């Protein structure tokens, strides 16, 4: 790292603080590997408060690895609906099937074997092995990188692989016997005290006595990230087509963005009224009346959809669509957030 700081005292400061201040979260009720794994996957790119309800609902429906491995894809997508990044849940099922086939349904304990499972990267493997099996395997994510950047007053961009490697190596050398608690304490500190958006709560930090960022008054300016590339903008026109109390849906392709999920019919580009009517006619339908129009935006990691939604009645339920009632859509169809925002009324 760019700065030198003795981290050997970090566990002794963090563990008592964590024991007193840790949040009561549903996935901390036990350390079953399946529960730790599920929570870590759900928490990727998703706020803790949003995950709580999904976690409980998912475990109620799929309480163990065998249930997950044999779950129907439509049911799985419906359980995940609203969490986004649906490749996570598809990989959960694939990994569960590997655990059933290769390990007889018993989650493996070896870091290398866990890392080899579909959808599990270095961070998640480290978290599972540390929390579930009490192994000294660092779980280095954005929270932990932010904490270390401030502790060490280090301006190295935290999104560079070499920065993550150095932090992982540093942490590997100071793990206490309470490995799982130390991993969670680092996560907790980054989530609640040493927070993002230039707003560390240094006065309440158990580590401020050893923190170079606090001592040098640089904590609020850290961490540093590489300049971001501009997100690509894409205009789309989305059709919410209705007929006799039913609505048109179709499946997205099995590969690519939002693979295999339901969507309202849509086309690239921002269509005016006549072009929109022509597009619906080209779908093999006969437009009757445009009910209303609306504007929505959805941001993915590397692309932003700027969407014009057109609510339109047609004469008959035709075309190559599935026509579902409102109840069927609510109970059965997993609509990703990009399209669900046109449905919520």
What are these regions (language model features)?
Residues 3-203, 207-216, 286:
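Catalytic cores of DNA base-excision repair glycosylases
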Residues 1-24, 29, 191-345:
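Intrinsically disordered, low-complexity, charged terminal extensions of DNA damage-control enzymes
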